[in-house]
Amino acid sequence: PVVMYVHGITSDRTSVMALGHTLASKCVATVAIDLPVHGVPANSNFAAALNVENSALIDFSALYGEDFHERHFNVVQGATGNPALMNFDNPTAQDGSGAWFINLANLGNTRDNLRQSVMDLMNLNASLQAISDLDIATNGTLDTDNVTVVGASLGAIVGSVFTTVNQIAIGNDMSFGSNLNPIKGLVASVGGTQLTQILNNSPTFAPRIQAGLAANGVNVGTSNYERFLYAAQSTVASGDPVNFAETLGTLGVPVLIQQVNGDAVVPNGDPALPLMGTEALASLTGATQFGPGAANVTSTPGYVKMTAGGHGSLLTPSGGAPQVTAEMQAQVVSFVLSSGAQVGIGTQAPGDVEAAP
């Protein structure tokens, strides 16, 4: 089996390693690329090895040429909010990845980053057979008939749209989609719908966004603020899963949605905003919530709520609950190996899985 992993915002392709080792132990190959304006940054533990312009271990220029660059172009958002060069000599928290993916000054750019992400994943999917044919290390070939998408956070948002568009492209025109592999399943971990309201209600992102708007005279609670939210959502809508999730739920693709209750990055939901958050993604796809036990999500999307852990628990222990990482990864592995027919829920941390209603 092959997993296409889609990383979260301000992360990069190397974040897959935290999950890739678990999948590899079950003979599952994992591939990942950077989303637009992301890449291995200066403050990454992998910069010295895997940043294509600054690696001390690998001569990437000999492999790809002198003009090969990370997708963040070594540009960060400086202290004043303006573009600044990434500092590789003395990197700080500022010298990270993906600072320009969400661009409030150019909402069309944000929309296009979302849509470009989908196109990039379609190209990666169409390239899997060519990657397999290379087999440089004679390690075997990729099973391109068994491709699953696993997305975390922004990766779940983008991955939901990609899976939908990929399947529609194949179904509408077999010749057009001849190089596209059908997706056998999607794990959307801590993602959601209605990006603008996710950001506006996120304890992590909202304070920064609201401060930036206030600095330009657009204050929370005013009609101008509501107009901005409306205009922003209208602009990014063509790349937002809020417009794809209902279709996704009808395509016959197994889907597993993971939620961490009290998520401080992507809100679970809000009764006043029924199209926002992880709960909205589950609702729009028609997902059924599962508690501990074996779940079959081949005909109806599945929805699992973790009562402990944090936003990043799929990849790294957070929220003081390392067992949740083992639990969420075990769910992913069983989903991939069974194509959604027998998802093991609660095998590692049954007490941290919310019971089904």
Tell where the protein language model's regions lie, with residue ranges:
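Serine-hydrolase catalytic core
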Residues: 141, 174-181, 195-198, 203-308, ...
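Alpha/beta-hydrolase-fold catalytic nucleophile elbow
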Residues: 34, 186-190, 258
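Domain-level recognition of soluble alpha/beta enzyme cores
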Residues: 1-2
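Cap/lid segment of the alpha/beta-hydrolase catalytic domain
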Residues: 5-125
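Flexible loop/turn segments at secondary-structure boundaries
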Residues: 10-14, 37-42, 124, 131, ...
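Catalytic active-site module of serine/aspartate enzymes centered on a nucleophile-bearing elbow/loop
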Residues: 313-357
